[in-house]
Amino acid sequence: MEFKERLRRRRSVRKYLSRPVEREVLDTVLREALAAPSSRNSHSTHLRVVTDPETIARIARMRDYGSAFLEHAPAVVLVEGDRTATDLWRENAAITATALLFAATDAGLASCWVHVNGRPCLKDQPDGAQAEDYLREFLPVPAEHGILCAVALGYSDFEPAALPPFDAGTHIHWPEK
């Protein structure tokens, strides 16, 4: 698939078929994502793969908003960053997560990013319990790892509506002479 086509086709999809994603497909997608650039080539990002439906259901309950759909994904990948490797672990993890979304598209998988880091479990209690702490209660995430996001992966027959027109020219700014 050409890069431009991949950019055009990649969409956040929240509806998945019950068909499991083959381990070989997941492994390929994950390895491609980890080939993404990182600050000072630190490779500070780690990917935690969850395919157990009961564990995925628990992950889906990490927030009372925007994460329930995860329960129907055949695979969820937690994108983690080693906070001891670099102070840019969030940026590195975001680059890897973006590469993961495009690698999934290339493999014929649907995907959707759900942010974890700095997000409360309850939307109306921003200073309350945090989604990241909730996940640490039942997942073996090392203390030195921060969890940036969860990415749902799966096959889907859902066809999202066409993207609305967007004038990229209004977001490109050239310095004045």
Predicted segments with their positions:
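Acidic, surface-exposed loops and disordered segments
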Residues: M1-K177
